[in-house]
Amino acid sequence: MLRGIPTLTLSLCLAAAAAPAALAQTAPAITEQEAHAIAVDAYVYFYPLLSMDITRKQFTNAEPGKDNFKGPMNTFVNVPEYPPADFKGVVRSNFDTLYSSSWLDMTREPVVISVPDTNGRFYLMPMLDMWTDVFASPGWRTTGTKAGTFLVTPPGWRPDLRERFAEEFRLPADTQRIDAPTPYVWIIGRTKTDGPPDYDVVRKIQAGYKVSPLSEFGKTPKPIEVKIDPSVDMKTAPKVQVDTMSAGVYFARAAELLKLHPPHITDEPIIAQMKRIGIEPGKSFDIGKLDPVLQRALDTAPQDGQKLMAWKVPTLARVVNGWSMNTDTMGVYGNYYLKRAIVAQVGLGANLPEDAIYPLNLADNTGKPLDGANKYTITFEKGAAPPVNAFWSITLYDQDGFQVGNPLNRFAVSSWMPFKHNPDGSLEIYFQNESPGADKEANWLPAPKGAFNLTMRLYGPKTEALTGKWNPPPVERAQTTVGLSAQ
């Protein structure tokens, strides 16, 4: 049992009792236990916001072209190739698409996003607000693959006057307006890539992804001025920075961010609760100015908040055939703040399930973790391949979540590959350290000699995958024949 960690529901229920007192000029009396419960809820609530802010600072405190994913705000940073075998900058790297990342800054004005005609090719431009909710997802599924223009506006911007936009800012008549919940936004763009031979085609598409401040749209782009901030910690991972903050630093930083990034309209209950411990939108926070009782209550909130998150992880997804399936409330979390925080901690930047889902293998058909000392297969019966409208893949990682170097330089198998099917039409994929034979190498995903795991990716999943009617088949461990010694 976790000491002093009542659930979010419990602490929010206290709001009803406190409502009349909230009308008074002075703060209502609160016990240390009540304050601690609210502080833990506040820690969980703010976790994605702080994670996004540190990630933004690291990713944008760089000159364009110096590093994958890093570059100034209001520019697209295009990743031109898959990560190499020895790349360890990101866990569970993607070998299906090439990324195009952009951090939008709309503190002064809206921005215009332009995309080229991808000629039917799958692409995705999910837009995350600073709370990590995907509020828009232009791309293959929603807006098609023709060239398009999107006007992204910050909170409180003036009403949509389409004709005035077209005349004053020279926007195309078919420009689509997207209202952003926060003035900073992260676009994590992806473009389908069928292996290295496809790079040149994809790079031409990436070159057509553009960001422009509204006042500069249609004009010659101004040179980008980059001022590197030496105070930004560029070496320590955002997760580590957030997880090691003291309560005073954490909540002070959260209060400053709350001045710029408004809470969602449905957050009012927890906002009302946080006022009881001195955290209020539009105001700075100093833990040293609190009553000693409140200081004690807040001091251990980070540790207990992280314990609560760790406790919840094992039950966050359903497990079927050894695969962890997480399709509910992904990308848009509503008031499920605990799940939102956990996703930000373990996989910042999650998509909407309608765009992509990621079954994670936890065990083989015997219930044991995967190990390269054994040989495994997964078999999709004829007509029972992963149900997608776009494409699917399976990627293999070592126990730390990194790709494994191998003679084929193959880190994933994907539906675009020329697989060799069985006579009955079924498809069998092999996961093992040594080649299954030259005639089967088209279906082979090389494994390390030690522990490994698998991630399946379904892009544009069909309804049966989203609802659980379809689930991945089990990963079967091959039976080994043990010789009997003469005794």
Write out the residue ranges for each language-model feature:
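C-terminal segment of classical bacterial N-terminal signal peptides
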Residues: 14-23
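Bacterial N-terminal signal peptides that target proteins for export
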Residues: 1-10
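General helical structural elements
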Residues: 7, 17-18, 461
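A compositional/structural signature for long, glycine/proline-rich flexible linkers
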Residues: 24-487
